[in-house]
Amino acid sequence: MGYKTKLAAICLPVAGMLFAMTAQAATTLDTVKERGRLICGASQGTPGFGAPDDNGYWRGLDIETCRAVAVAVLGDKDAVDFVPLSGQQRIPALQTGEIDILPRTLTWTLQRDANGINFTQPNYYEYTGFMMPKSLGITQVEDMAGASVCVQTGSTTEVVVNDVSTKHKLDLQPVVFDNTSAARQAFFSGRCDALITDAGALASVRASMAKNPDDYIIFPATPYVDALTPAVRQGDDQWMDIVRWSIQALIAAESFGITRENVDAMLGV
């Protein structure tokens, strides 16, 4: 099967879902189409995943996920409004209908899956990590006894700190913050020995906020790999399918080397 056939096998069902949803008056699609905008939950600034550039234009992996859905539903990648949300705010915002889709570096967990949201298709796999100043001489979890850790409340990393501390008998001291920005600023101001979050986000923070990125080390908090996965509300399975297959189309396009510059030539248009 050639790449055109494979890509068509992915994209054509999305078009079919859109037609079926129009006929069945599915709530989320109707709301988005009537509004003419897709409302997407975003981070409060994580370069590489979701952050505005110097001109205020949002960029990043999660941002492009939302734009792909906007193209599928509205035919316009810029018909998206991005709502910055903290770890505590993001899931309630989806549950209450404040947003239509939630990428925002969201880890797929059983507890979340059972609380009114459905996960679609992972768009990034990574581990949870610690970042610490190299000057402390710590390079692995087992050496962190008594360390203070900046952590954002409402995130899976809050649980990881407690689990790691118990498992290795480290007596870690969580310093909890309501939002990502406050946790990061506290870490770089020296209030905590370590900062915990997804490793990709740590690399982004180190590159964008550290005066000298080489002064900091990142290492795994656990041996497990997390699936960061955009989520939608439960009870709207066809909307979930549209989001899922929009992401699949992005993955397929990347594997075939299809870009905005060569898409017409690659598809023979």
Q: Which positions does each model-derived feature cover?
A:
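Acidic, polar ligand-binding/catalytic clefts
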Residues: 67, 71, 75, 79-143, ...
